[in-house]
Design a protein with these regions (language model features):
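A membrane-interface helix-boundary motif in multi-pass transporters
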Residues: 1-6, 189-207
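Structural signature of the two symmetry-related core transmembrane helices
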Residues: 109-124, 204
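C-terminal membrane-cytosol helix-exit motif in multi-pass small-molecule transporters
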Residues: 6-26, 213
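Juxtamembrane intracellular "pre-TM" segments in multi-pass secondary transporters
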Residues: 21-48
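Pair of pore-lining "gating" transmembrane helices in MFS-fold secondary transporters
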Residues: 41-61, 139
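Intracellular juxtamembrane helix-capping segments at the cytosolic ends
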Residues: 147-161
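Helix-to-loop junctions at the C-terminal end of transmembrane segments
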Residues: 93-107, 191
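A late C-terminal transmembrane helix in Major Facilitator Superfamily
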Residues: 159, 164-193
Length: 213
């Protein structure tokens, strides 16, 4: 229930209050470094920001449309809840080992795997409209988002010096959440006007962009 969220929020507040961050260096406190435009033109920044933005944008585009699409396909509320529960598991459960995968196989390989998982999600989604089609598609979508988001933000740390950290991360967050907001705005409109299959097809160029970045 909504009341339980109060308890979760209080626990989160207590944990956050107990955190102790290392003090910032002088360069971090006063900023400086290269102009933001120069940082953003680096290939490493482009790949990192693009991966995170595509991960968030495509995930949000398809996830937000899923309840409507499943309703249009005659699937019930319980089916929708089941699919979205597993989607959320796919989003966050891999976080326990994504860092280890990055350390072992390299961040670029993890990003590539995330893009391939999103591509697999689309392939499954356009093949049919049964419960299992939605379940597999949304599960893979969640795992793909995890790899692209964590991989992208990990790679981003190679794009800046300590004095440039705040503005570089700020730009990355802006691009990422701009993609998220845009996909949220168009998701419902597209699935109701064009359909679930077309919505997935629209996501293909963005996923391809992250694959070949």
């Amino acid at each position: 229930s909504y009341a339980s969220l109060i308890g979760f929020a209080l626990v989160a507040m207590a944990i956050a209050a107990s955190l102790r961050f290392p003090p910032q260096s002088q360069s971090e406190q006063h900023g400086g470094g290269r102009p933001l435009g120069e940082i953003a033109r680096q290939p490493v920044f482009i790949v990192a920001a693009l991966s995170a933005a595509v991960g968030y944008g495509v995930m949000n585009l398809l996830m937000n449309a899923t309840p409507l699409a499943m309703d249009f396909c005659g699937l019930g509320f319980g089916d929708t809840a089941f699919v979205l529960q597993w989607h959320v598991i796919g989003m966050f459960a891999p976080s326990f080992f994504t860092g280890h995968l990055i350390a072992r196989f390299g961040v670029l390989n993890v990003l590539f795997a995330g893009a391939l998982l999103m591509a697999a999600c689309i392939v499954i989604a356009v093949q049919g409209i049964t419960l299992m089609h939605f379940w597999w598609a949304l599960l893979l979508l969640g795992i793909g988002w995890n790899f692209l988001y964590i991989g992208g933000t990990t790679l981003l740390t190679e794009a800046y010096a300590p004095a440039e950290k705040a503005k570089t991360q700020g730009l990355n967050d802006f691009l990422m959440f701009f993609a998220m907001a845009g996909s949220s705005f168009f998701s419902g409109v597209l699935v109701t006007s064009a359909g679930w299959t077309v919505l997935n097809q629209i996501a293909i160029p963005f996923v391809a962009l992250s694959v070949f970045a």
